[in-house]
């Protein structure tokens, strides 16, 4: 890959894991270069001002951690918020072009699967049986009792790679 440079990266469209959101929901798309203070200023202003009752922080790749951080800060500053978290992988398509045109190399397109997170914070009660629900006042990481469909998937057996 030393003879290639990245020409661009495109996140392929995917459906939201939370399609049933009310129309007044504030959707905060967190990017790698987003400033946390700007994101928090808008989200806290709308929540505390009463113009919205729901905020969704979403981020993929390196921005996933920043989206979770924003949600945790908002939960700490606005008491009584219900939380619903969804995780999934998104496809990203990277384009690579040769660094010098006379090498005879073709342009490349690479598809990657990157982790993504959506965190819904709501003043209104949410369905506690939903996978990823966390009630107000619960310490981070300690949500409701998971239903059997929410637990981790069974691990696959490791393949024997010895020859």
Curated annotation (Swiss-Prot):
Highest taxon of source: Eukaryota
InterPro entries: Alba-like_dom_sf, Alba-like_NAB, DNA/RNA-bd_Alba-like
Entry's Gene Ontology molecular function annotations: nucleic acid binding
Keyword Nucleus: yes
Biased composition (Basic residues): 153-163
Keyword terms, alphabetized: Nucleus
Main location: nucleus
Functional description taken from the UniProt entry: May be a component of ribonuclease P or MRP.
PANTHER family: RIBONUCLEASE P PROTEIN SUBUNIT P25-LIKE PROTEIN, RIBONUCLEASE P SUBUNIT P25
Family that this chain belongs to: Belongs to the histone-like Alba family.
Official protein name in the record: Ribonuclease P protein subunit p25-like protein
Organism annotation: Mus musculus
Gene that specifies this protein: Rpp25l
